[in-house]
């Protein structure tokens, strides 16, 4: 069923599996129109909210899980999700703190902070926190209607993102979309260490490409065929974008992720700066892992990125780091 959202991404998909047990995959945002659409979708199959016995969540973004708590409260349905998104599902304060820390590391001016915090507050209106859920692990098998749903952990867009595979069908959440690519959003470990999400996303896409699936049922948009081809195309897209980031950085000199985002996405407003910065940080992470970019902390704590020696040599700049930085001989 297709549920409306107030977000630029447009409608979100929820998938009803007749079971037994009757299973709903994702539940839409907490809005009156999405709730009415969910009820109408259930009625179309002769069902009421009380008939839903299991809710499986692909990831902890409000457009996908916002109504899960309300539906479970009515039906007593078991809610299942990956524990890595637990702070999102429970509205833990650390989620907002980590977003602000990511902006600081990226060198985003403090003037953007109020708009970002307001966006987070608006997002908070789109879901009721879960008080409890059953954690899902990679490889878990969920019996459903005489078959089995296989859980595949697909981090990158969100730390606890999962996909479900059964009988040639892939319920992919937001990791595999036909018309757009999922943003590699900034994530932190419980200990406060930033996770390099784009490398994880590419690993997830390559893993999905290898699955025995023929049809994708995505989080947004209609079903489509050939998940392997689409997953491979998305990996190639991110590799090309990383090359573009490398070229801009080599030409511009040392930059913060925010400064690079301003060059790559000029005119980005405060509400979208988090997405722009997260994407640039993701591609920088790929380049750092490949030895083509070096990162260091500036005096104010922001991370500064510069082209590594290998990248500069490849572009015809053969000065070593010491010569460029004025290092004296011992």
Where are these regions (language model features)?
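Short glycine/proline- and charge-enriched loop/turn segments
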Residues: 96-100, 183-190, 264-267
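Residue-level marker for buried hydrophobic side chains located in beta-strands
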Residues: 23-25, 56, 79, 171, ...
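Metallo-beta-lactamase
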Residues: 29-31, 122-127, 131-133, 141-143, ...
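Short, contiguous alpha-helical
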Residues: 73, 154, 288
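Conserved beta-strand hairpin/beta-sheet module of binuclear metal-dependent hydrolase folds
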Residues: 1-45, 49-51, 163-178
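Active-site HxH/HxHxD metal-binding segment of metal-dependent hydrolases
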Residues: 10, 33-36, 43-143
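Histidine-centered divalent metal-coordination motifs
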Residues: 58-64, 82, 155-157, 161, ...
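C-terminal regulatory/interaction regions
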Residues: 244-330
């Amino acid at each position: 069923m297709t549920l409306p959202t107030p977000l630029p991404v447009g409608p979100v998909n929820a998938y009803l599996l007749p079971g037994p047990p009757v299973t709903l995959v994702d539940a839409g945002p907490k809005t009156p129109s999405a709730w009415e659409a969910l009820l109408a979708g259930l009625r179309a199959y002769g069902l009421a909210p009380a008939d839903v016995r299991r809710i499986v969540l692909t990831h902890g973004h409000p457009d996908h899980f916002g109504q899960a708590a309300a539906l479970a409260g009515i039906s007593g349905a078991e809610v299942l999700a990956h524990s890595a998104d637990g702070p999102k599902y429970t509205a833990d304060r650390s989620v907002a703190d980590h977003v602000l820390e990511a902006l600081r590391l990226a060198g985003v001016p403090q003037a953007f902070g109020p708009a970002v915090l307001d966006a987070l507050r608006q997002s908070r209106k789109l879901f009721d926190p879960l008080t409890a859920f059953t954690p899902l692990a990679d490889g878990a098998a969920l019996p459903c209607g005489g078959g089995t749903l296989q859980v595949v952990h697909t981090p990158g867009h969100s730390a606890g993102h999962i996909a479900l595979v059964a009988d040639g069908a892939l319920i992919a959440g937001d990791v595999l979309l036909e018309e757009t690519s999922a943003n590699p959003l900034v994530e932190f470990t419980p200990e406060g260490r930033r996770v390099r999400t784009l490398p994880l996303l590419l690993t997830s896409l390559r893993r999905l490409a290898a699955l025995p699936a023929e049809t994708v049922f995505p989080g947004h948009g209609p079903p489509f065929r050939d998940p392997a081809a689409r997953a491979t195309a998305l990996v190639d897209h991110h590799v090309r974008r990383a090359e573009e980031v490398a070229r801009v950085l080599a030409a511009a000199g040392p930059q913060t992720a925010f400064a690079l985002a301003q060059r790559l996405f000029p005119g980005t407003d405060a509400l979208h700066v988090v997405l722009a910065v997260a994407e640039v940080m993701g591609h920088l992470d790929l380049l750092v892992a490949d030895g083509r970019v070096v990162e260091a902390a500036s005096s104010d704590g922001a991370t500064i990125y510069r082209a590594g020696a290998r990248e500069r040599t490849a572009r015809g700049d053969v000065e070593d780091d010491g010569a460029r930085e004025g290092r004296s001989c011992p």
